[in-house]
């Protein structure tokens, strides 16, 4: 009987997929309700479905302007969908259980481990709790800092909501905005504070919770006079790739666009292109070369266990290492450690599938 029951249980990956499908169905129903619509423009079932899928998958693509088409209720629904999409339905559910002092089953631990790309089964409950606290703390700080931008252009109550929504959308790499202008966040193209806050939120969300937790642990040890441990190999690769993609991407965008974009605009475009989807400069104004750079950044995306998508920075790194290894005939190594053949094969398969799907 137990064997039959085990066979009938869905794998962690299937449970995660089923959870997302359930959230998409619920979100579509809620956004289809009249209470979710502002009445300023028509919102059909397909618009509601598209908005839901885009929010849960944190892509930032829209068929109707979020700020103009949806009421406050609809915008709250989208914000929740962005939060679920960034954290993951299983991680979010398990996080509330952990925060309330509950215990996760062995199966629950397995599902969360799969969702967050956690390497072991030990300390999962504590890890989930820290992820939840870290997530909401960063979003709260982001909302507070964003408020000083929006309050200059909108009434206080409106500025508060715009700040909260923007912080959630930025940290979860969602790309949605509720300004209702139709040009994303173009009105803040030259606002240095807005650009900095938004970029920091996007980058933090794209690093991955395990890397952020590791960095905070090192900072805490330093402040309390304890011995500071070394960064894990995963964290080193993620931080290195993030720096290369952000500044390398910005340099290429600036070189391809020249005087048509400022240095700040190039950095913002490089950061947001990887997974977020905000725009201070209209994409239609970019050259073909600039769009190609943006496309490469979009394919690579964020890091494992983060709020963003893409093939992941670590996969791109291992893939490039594999290519260099084949060309030079040398063993693929990273920070003096040999890269496993299995990891290189997985990276090659992921990149190949991504390219075939796009083409």
Where are these regions (language model features)?
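Membrane-proximal intracellular helices of multi-pass ion channels
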Residues: 1-359
């Amino acid at each position: 009987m137990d064997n039959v029951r085990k066979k009938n249980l869905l794998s962690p990956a299937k449970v995660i997929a089923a959870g997302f499908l359930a959230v998409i169905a619920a979100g579509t129903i809620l956004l289809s309700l009249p209470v979710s619509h502002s009445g300023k423009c028509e919102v059909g079932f397909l618009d509601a479905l598209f908005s839901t899928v885009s929010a849960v998958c944190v892509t930032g693509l829209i068929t109707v302007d979020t700020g103009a088409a949806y009421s406050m209720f609809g915008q709250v629904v989208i914000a929740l969908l962005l939060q679920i999409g960034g954290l993951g339905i299983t991680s979010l559910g398990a996080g509330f259980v952990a925060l309330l002092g509950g215990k996760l089953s062995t199966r629950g631990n397995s599902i969360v481990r799969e969702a967050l790309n956690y390497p072991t089964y030990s300390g999962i409950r504590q890890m989930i709790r820290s992820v939840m606290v870290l997530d909401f703390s960063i979003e709260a700080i982001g909302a507070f800092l964003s408020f000083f931008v929006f309050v200059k252009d909108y009434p206080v109550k409106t500025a508060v909501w715009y700040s909260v929504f923007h912080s959630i959308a930025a940290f979860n790499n969602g790309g949605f905005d509720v300004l209702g202008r139709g040009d994303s966040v173009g009105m803040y193209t030259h606002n240095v504070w807005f650009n900095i806050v938004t970029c920091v939120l996007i980058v933090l969300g794209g690093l991955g919770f395990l890397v952020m937790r590791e960095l905070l642990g090192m900072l805490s040890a330093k402040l309390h006079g304890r011995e500071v441990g070394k960064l894990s190999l995963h964290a080193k690769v993620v931080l290195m790739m993030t720096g290369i993609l952000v500044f390398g991407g910005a340099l290429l965008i600036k070189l391809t666009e020249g005087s048509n974009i400022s240095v700040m605009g190039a950095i913002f475009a490089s950061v947001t292109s990887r997974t977020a989807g905000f725009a201070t400069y209209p994409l239609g104004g970019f050259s073909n070369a600039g769009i190609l750079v943006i496309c490469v950044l979009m394919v690579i995306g964020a890091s494992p266990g983060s709020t963003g998508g893409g093939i992941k920075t670590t996969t791109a790194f291992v893939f490039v290492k594999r290519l260099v290894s084949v060309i030079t005939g040398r063993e693929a190594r990273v920070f003096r450690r040999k890269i496993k053949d299995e990891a290189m094969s997985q990276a090659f398969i992921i990149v190949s599938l991504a390219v075939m799907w796009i083409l």
